[in-house]
């Protein structure tokens, strides 16, 4: 079928599948990052399609901070069991030994040690030369200027001023020993594209994306869900049952919920058509300091 005969979502799907297949053929030891969110779920679905009826020929890696929502971990394990993909889970052992907590140590230190350093540990441990990520250019300004094939040096750092040209969808995956490429097959998708594709393909998601009554407290202008008994409450502070959902998912102490009645995919898509705010406004790690996401990416974050 000619490209002009494909629908918008079909064109995005075809581009992403081409990228996934090209990486699988070009690199010796690729891995797909699996953060359990909606973008990861779409990327997993595309990988399954890319190699159907065979199995995905590379593992999925979850860098677990030990502070994810309980529903996310349960969903992760259910997906691995249902689809039979190889799942690698890595936790930063030094961070666990130090007892790193977003409450005691703050979002910046927690993210650096448990996410960035944990990711670099896992990539070094398994010797991966390419790693798929679910980032999209419409999410955030530093991601908007990143290539589909994002070169990382032997320290896993990113230099936005030294990126490779990608003319006519031609990608340069040449790396020396110790270097790697971060690959973003969803680069050209928007948040609305993601939701419409989830609806079209009937992709399973963590229930946290759908509105229901949940126990939350207000912190720094954000509604934080009390997911377990590790969350310290201020004197007199009591969680309230509010009808909320999550537009983006991460560590529960650093992820804000939003008031919503969208408990179906159709209602979420309708909500997305009307929204004028960024999905990442609910992520505390993006507001640590000016240009905080670009700084994290320079240091090795996805």
UniProtKB/Swiss-Prot annotation:
Keyword Nucleotidyltransferase among record annotations: yes
GO MF term (any one): ATP binding
InterPro entries xrefs: PAPS_reduct_dom, Rossmann-like_a/b/a_fold, SO4_adenylTrfase_ssu, Sulfate_adenylyltrnsfr_sub2
Pfam family name, one: PAPS_reduct
GO BP of this protein: hydrogen sulfide biosynthetic process; sulfate assimilation
Keywords assigned: ATP-binding, Nucleotide-binding, Nucleotidyltransferase, Transferase
NCBIfam families with a match to the protein in the record: CysD, PRK05253.1, PRK12563.1
HAMAP family tied to this protein: Sulf_adenylyltr_sub2
Name of this protein: Sulfate adenylyltransferase subunit 2
Gene name per UniProt: cysD
């Amino acid at each position: 079928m000619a490209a002009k005969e494909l629908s918008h979502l079909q064109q995005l799907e075809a581009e992403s599948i081409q990228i996934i297949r090209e990486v699988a053929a070009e690199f010796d030891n690729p891995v797909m990052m699996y953060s359990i969110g909606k973008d990861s779920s779409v990327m997993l679905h595309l990988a399954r399609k890319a190699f159907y009826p065979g199995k995905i020929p590379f593992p999925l890696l979850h860098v677990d901070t030990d502070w994810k929502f309980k529903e996310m971990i349960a969903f992760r394990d259910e997906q691995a069991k249902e689809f039979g993909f190889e799942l690698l889970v890595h936790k930063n052992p030094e961070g666990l030994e130090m007892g790193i907590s977003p409450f005691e140590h703050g979002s910046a230190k927690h993210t650096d040690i448990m996410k960035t350093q944990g990711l670099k540990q896992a990539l070094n441990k398994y010797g991966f030369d390419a790693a798929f990520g679910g980032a999209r250019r419409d999410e955030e300004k530093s991601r908007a200027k990143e290539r589909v094939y994002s070169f990382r040096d032997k320290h896993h750092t990113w230099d936005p001023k030294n990126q490779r040209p990608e003319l006519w969808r031609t990608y340069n995956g040449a790396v020396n020993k110790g270097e790697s490429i971060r690959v973003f097959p969803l680069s050209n998708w928007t948040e609305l594209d993601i939701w419409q594709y989830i609806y079209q393909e009937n992709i399973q998601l963590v229930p946290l994306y759908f509105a229901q009554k949940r126990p939350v407290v207000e912190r720094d202008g954000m509604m934080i869900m009390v997911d377990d008994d590790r969350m310290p409450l201020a004197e007199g502070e009591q969680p309230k049952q509010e009808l909320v959902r999550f537009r983006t998912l991460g560590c529960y102490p650093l992820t804000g919920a939003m008031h919503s009645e969208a408990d179906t995919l159709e209602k979420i898509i309708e909500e997305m058509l009307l929204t004028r705010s960024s999905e990442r406004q609910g992520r505390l790690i993006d507001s640590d300091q000016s240009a905080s996401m670009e700084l994290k990416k320079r240091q090795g974050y996805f």
